[in-house]
Design a protein with these regions (language model features):
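Acidic, Asp/Glu-rich intrinsically disordered regulatory regions of eukaryotic Ca2+-responsive proteins
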Residues: 1-504
Length: 504
């Protein structure tokens, strides 16, 4: 109950007490006045606060944060739904199978290869089909809550209750790409390679898109990446190898063959000794130890057993062959930052350079003293703070490959030393190349692998020697001994045998 704002002096009892106080008597405030005085003071304070508050501005500030995309006023949801219903009317009982979802995706104004996520999000995996009513209910909800492609794609793939994507969320989507893309048609008879190709693509997606290293792709990360643009290109580009950032089969082949050479027991795990054999022991043992320390790998089981998985190897190989990308710089920085303080000290640089000096001594090459090497690297990086190199310093540097190779890759270090320094500087100061270091490496290695296999597969039928066309080798790009073990069962090999007979 609000107390009226009146002076307490008007109270007759209080006036009597005040008169006694004026004559020199002690002032005794009756207990009944204490509550009234307290209520009076509270009203006065509340009135003062209300007077000092500025007028509310909430009505004048428009909404500026749209986590699911900015709403589009001109979108007519009913028209979109009507278009979808007309598409479903073409199917028996107005039910769409996975093969029909390409038309449905187009009716939704989505790229063709969203068809798998659309099908699975509407519950098609359980029944083998999607009814028009269930799909319309699902898509209407998405249109009402998701206002851009990134928000829609995440909603289609994510688990209920999540607002991010983990690696497992991409498997159904990529399996549909493997099953239906014309550039991967030769994989239909080699189902055992589906999971390995999918694993490779997933790791490349997270390598490029998941900039936070959290293992969870957020809406913001997806919007900042070019992944959805590459998904749209799947429809336009029949040659999967032209999509070099994520989906290239040739890149998968190079990565898998490099791993297969190291994985002697073929359990899809390698230990320290296996990884040390990469590129003829070019990587220092101290760096190998750091890779297995868990600084750049995930999974407690692998770390406990002292092994890394094929998925971890994908990150390693891409980082090793292209040390200029943000993720690769972060990868090697984590490895070299021994104490995890966010900076590379001179002691940490010396720790890795010591082994490089030992290798150079074994090769009868006089190593550069560490002090001189350090001066060169500081001139190269130009750190902001004296005595330490931060991640920001390395990302500003255009020759991070030279910096990292100096401390843990002896072969590439010697290559840099033999190069003309002016040409190195000229390359670093030029515009960003159209072909990255990784793409250049993958193309060269693929040509080498194809040439080696082409030389190995010469068939002699009578007096006629038949050499496999390159296209056959491309389509049958599996490991050599795996091919031999599948000659009797692989349909492609049967076709090849017919081809050889025709040549004869």
């Amino acid at each position: 109950m609000r107390i009226k704002e009146i002076s307490l002096r008007q109270d007759p009892d209080l006036r009597k007490e005040l008169a006694l106080l004026a004559r020199g008597c002690d002032f005794v405030l009756p207990s009944r006045f204490k509550k009234r005085l307290k209520a009076f003071q509270q009203v006065q304070v509340q009135t003062k606060k209300e007077e000092t508050l500025p007028p509310s501005l909430s009505q004048t500030i428009p909404t500026f944060y749209f986590p699911r995309g900015c709403p589009k006023e001109k979108v007519n949801i009913d028209a979109v739904i009507a278009k979808i219903e007309r598409t479903f009317s073409q199917f028996p009982n107005e039910r769409a199978t996975l093969d029909d979802m390409g038309k449905v995706a187009k009716a939704c104004d989505c790229p063709l290869y969203w068809k798998g996520p659309l099908f699975y999000c509407a519950g098609g995996e359980r029944t083998g089909y999607v009814s028009v009513h269930k799909f319309v209910a699902m898509w209407r909800k998405i249109l009402q809550t998701c206002y851009d492609d990134a928000a829609k794609f995440v909603h289609l793939l994510m688990n209920p209750g999540c607002n991010y994507l983990v690696q497992e969320d991409f498997i159904p989507f990529l399996q549909d790409v493997v099953n239906s893309h014309p550039g991967l048609s030769f994989l239909k008879e080699a189902s055992e390679f589906h999971s390995r190709y999918i694993t490779t693509v997933i790791q490349r997606i997270f390598y490029t898109v998941n900039r936070s290293w959290s293992g969870k792709i957020t809406l913001t990360e997806l919007r900042k990446s070019n992944f959805l643009q590459n998904v749209a290109l799947l429809e336009e580009e029949a040659d999967i190898n032209q999509l070099t950032e994520y989906f290239s089969y040739e890149h998968f082949y190079v990565i898998y063959c490099k791993f297969w050479e190291l994985d002697t027991d073929h359990d899809l795990y390698i230990d320290r000794k296996d990884l040390a054999r990469h590129n003829d022991h070019a990587i220092s043992s101290r760096m190998i130890e750091r890779i297995f320390s868990g600084a750049v790998t995930r999974g407690r089981k692998a770390q406990k057993d002292g092994k890394i998985s094929y998925a971890d190897f994908v990150w390693f190989l891409i980082s090793e062959e292209d040390k200029k990308t943000p993720t690769s710089i972060e990868y090697w920085f984590r490895c070299m930052d021994l104490d995890g303080d966010g900076a590379l000290s001179m002691y940490e640089l010396e720790y890795f350079y010591e082994e490089q000096c030992q290798k150079l001594d074994n090769m009868a090459i006089e190593p550069l003293p560490f002090e001189d090497c350090l001066c060169q690297m500081l001139d190269l990086v130009k750190p902001q703070y004296e005595g330490k190199i931060t991640l920001h310093d390395l990302k500003r540097c255009k020759l991070t490959n030279v910096f990292f190779d100096t401390f843990f890759n002896i072969e590439k270090y010697l290559d840099h030393e033999q190069k003309d320094q002016f040409s190195i500087l000229r390359d670093s100061e030029g515009e960003s190349p159209e072909v990255s270091d990784w793409e250049r490496y993958a193309a060269e290695e693929y040509d080498i692998l194809v040439a080696e296999e082409a030389a190995s597969f010469h068939f002699v039928l009578g007096s006629t020697e038949v050499q496999l066309p390159k296209s056959w080798i491309c389509n049958l790009s599996f490991s050599l001994h795996e091919k031999i073990s599948k000659i009797s069962t692989n349909l492609n090999w049967f076709r090849l045998w017919i081809f050889c007979l025709e040549k004869k």
